[in-house]
């Protein structure tokens, strides 16, 4: 078996698998490979246990500006359209209602203004008053005594929407389709990249077991591990990484659909939301929490897996200055401390209950169950030159046949849009072709028309 490929993707999560499919379906490349360190695809951030299983299209994510929502909507619709085209309904993609709610006069005023801006972007977006919310999500309104909550409450959303995705199942489908299209493609599991070497016009990917795979172009879609790999080759030395781990709590099956809350614009992390779980029937997931930890990947034991690569990246005065500036802000400091408390036994559950009751006011302590084994680390990039936290996705383009992607949420939602960008870069570098019109025709006819 030849170990030489036109392009090799490091990382078998949904982003890497989406690019594997996109190159196989729409480009003239002959051979593409994925190398993945785990024994199966999509076992870390793309696992159904690691994320909220949401297609983040911007309609109920209250931290999105209208401009960002327009872009994210098109990205999300590509991923949704692919799943529907491939018949993945009720296998990978699920239909449910969804809404964002504002609680209290200040948040209600914000939601009213937001609706006026967003109804033009999302056709069919509906405003919900308190009575309508009670009809759609009775447990959002009913208190423990069976009496309606006293706060003013308003929301908007969709009564029915393809809003839930099992990204692990989607990843598997991407790869199955790619292998049908190009039988010479390969997937290498249990291949943890130790080193990447440039050898003339080819890159050698060397595993911890001394196996070697060769590529004319390397795309690193390895989540938290992307930046350490980049820095091992001398790229991205001006960057650091703040790994933030999210945790969830289970409650009984009390929500009919997704319920999101208003996010504090000063905080770079999602506000608490409720999601009926797609893989564990009869459970609703509430979260996430957000806890910074010195690990590139979450493990059951807190001390297990502390990353030496991360310590090497972050043990310098610039990173400490960024951390100090963040913690100097009272709201951010209180948020960080509160989320540290959420992880503590007994007291954490009691404190988290207060946040969860914003969504389901009748919740009791007995209803909450810490979701062990759920949640994962998201790499937040630190710019050591600007001394600031960089929000969103980060890309290091070397223009030398290797690109590094760091894709925190909503990277899974945008996987096909990101795959399009990366695929176009790869084919341009290799002098190959890409069927852009057919890509849009299949996945985003709206963009083709415009």
From Swiss-Prot:
Its EC number is 1.1.5.4. One of its GO terms (biological process) is tricarboxylic acid cycle. Pathway: Carbohydrate metabolism; tricarboxylic acid cycle; oxaloacetate from (S)-malate (quinone route): step 1/1. It catalyses: (S)-malate + a quinone = a quinol + oxaloacetate. Its cofactor is FAD. InterPro entries: FAD/NAD-bd_sf, MQO. GO terms for cellular component: cytoplasm. Keywords: FAD, Flavoprotein, Oxidoreductase, Tricarboxylic acid cycle. One of its GO terms (molecular function) is 2-hydroxyglutarate dehydrogenase activity. Belongs to the MQO family. This is Probable malate:quinone oxidoreductase. It comes from Helicobacter acinonychis (strain Sheeba). The lineage of its organism: Bacteria, Pseudomonadati, Campylobacterota, Epsilonproteobacteria, Campylobacterales.
């Amino acid at each position: 078996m030849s170990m030489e490929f036109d392009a090799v993707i490091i990382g078998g999560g949904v982003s890497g698998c989406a690019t594997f499919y996109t190159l196989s379906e729409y480009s003239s490349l002959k051979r593409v490979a994925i190398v993945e360190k785990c024994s199966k695809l999509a076992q870390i951030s793309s696992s159904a246990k690691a994320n909220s299983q949401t297609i983040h299209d911007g309609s109920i994510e209250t931290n999105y500006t209208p401009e960002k929502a327009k872009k994210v909507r098109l990205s999300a619709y590509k991923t949704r359209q692919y799943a529907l085209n491939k018949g993945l309904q009720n296998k990978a993609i699920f239909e449910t209602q969804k809404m964002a709610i504002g609680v209290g006069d200040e948040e209600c005023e914000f939601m009213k203004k937001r609706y006026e801006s967003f109804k033009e972007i999302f056709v069919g977006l509906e405003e919900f008053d308190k009575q309508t919310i009670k009809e759609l999500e009775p447990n959002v309104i009913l208190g423990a005594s069976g009496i309606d909550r006293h706060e003013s409450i308003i929301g908007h959303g969709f009564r029915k929407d393809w809003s839930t995705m099992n990204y692990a199942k989607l990843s598997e489908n991407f790869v199955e389709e790619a292998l049908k299209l190009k039988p010479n493609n390969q997937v290498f599991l249990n291949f943890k990249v130790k080193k990447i070497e440039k050898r003339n016009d080819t890159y050698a990917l060397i595993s911890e077991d001394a196996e070697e795979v060769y590529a004319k172009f390397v795309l690193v879609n390895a989540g938290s591990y992307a930046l350490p790999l980049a820095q091992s080759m001398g790229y991205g030395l001006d960057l650091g990484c703040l790994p933030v781990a999210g945790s969830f709590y289970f409650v009984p099956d009390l929500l009919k659909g997704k319920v999101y809350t208003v996010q504090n614009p000063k905080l770079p992390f999602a506000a608490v939301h409720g999601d009926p779980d797609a893989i564990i029937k009869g459970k609703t997931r509430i979260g996430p929490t957000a806890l910074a930890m010195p690990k590139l990947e979450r493990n059951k034991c807190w001390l297990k897996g502390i990353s030496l690569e991360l310590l090497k990246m972050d043990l310098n005065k610039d990173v400490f200055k960024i951390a100090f500036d963040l913690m100097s802000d009272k709201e951010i400091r209180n948020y960080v401390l509160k989320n540290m408390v959420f992880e503590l036994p007994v007291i954490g559950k009691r404190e988290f209950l207060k946040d969860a009751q914003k969504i389901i006011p009748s919740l009791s302590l007995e209803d909450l169950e810490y979701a062990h084994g759920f949640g994962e680390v998201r790499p937040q990039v630190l710019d050591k030159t600007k001394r600031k936290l960089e929000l969103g996705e980060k890309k290091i383009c070397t223009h030398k046949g290797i690109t590094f992607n760091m894709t925190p949420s909503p990277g899974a939602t945008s996987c096909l849009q990101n795959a399009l960008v990366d695929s176009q870069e790869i084919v341009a570098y290799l002098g190959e072709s890409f069927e852009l019109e057919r890509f849009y025709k299949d996945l985003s006819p709206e963009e083709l028309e415009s």
